[in-house]
């Protein structure tokens, strides 16, 4: 691998921008790691909360428990938050922790193959 490729290759690839992906990205930032990329197959963040927009879609866990411990939300409008409010919270986290520049939207992972000899992963997207 030449130096120019190595310098632009992320040291961490996070698949998806649901709660798990966003949390990992924020924790990497908190640890001082900036060489990460989130690959998101859709055009926006949110995972299940982006995809499930049916009437009445809501959390089945009390809202005050449904936020990151390091970014609590105390002003939920309901005991069990509705999908739009949860998605807004996730977007708030993307903005507050400046993650947008690390996200590649419309970029679906096709495969991830580990090479034991080099201790590296090769991640391929549907676009190549």
Predicted regions, residues:
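N-terminal Rossmann-like FAD-binding beta1-loop-alpha1 element of flavoenzymes
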Residues: 10-38
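A short, basic/flexible loop-to-alpha-helix module at the beginning of a structural domain
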Residues: 1-10
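FAD-dinucleotide binding site
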Residues: 8, 35-37, 51-52, 61-62, ...
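Feature captures the FAD/FMN-dependent oxidoreductase FAD-binding
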Residues: 78-128
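N-terminal FAD cofactor-binding segment of flavoenzymes
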Residues: 27-65
């Amino acid at each position: 691998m030449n130096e120019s490729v190595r310098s632009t290759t992320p040291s961490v690839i996070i698949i998806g921008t649901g709660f798990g992906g966003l949390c990992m990205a924020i924790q990497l930032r908190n640890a001082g790691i900036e060489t990460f990329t989130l690959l998101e197959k859709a055009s926006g963040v949110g995972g299940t909360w982006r995809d499930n927009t049916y009437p009445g879609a809501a959390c089945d866990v009390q809202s005050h428990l449904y936020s990151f411990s390091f970014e609590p939300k105390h002003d939920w409008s309901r005991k069990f938050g509705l999908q739009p409010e949860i998605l807004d919270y996730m977007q708030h986290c993307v903005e507050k922790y400046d993650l947008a520049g690390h996200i590649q939207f419309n970029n679906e992972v096709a495969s991830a193959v580990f090479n034991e000899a080099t201790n590296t992963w090769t991640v391929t997207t549907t676009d190549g």
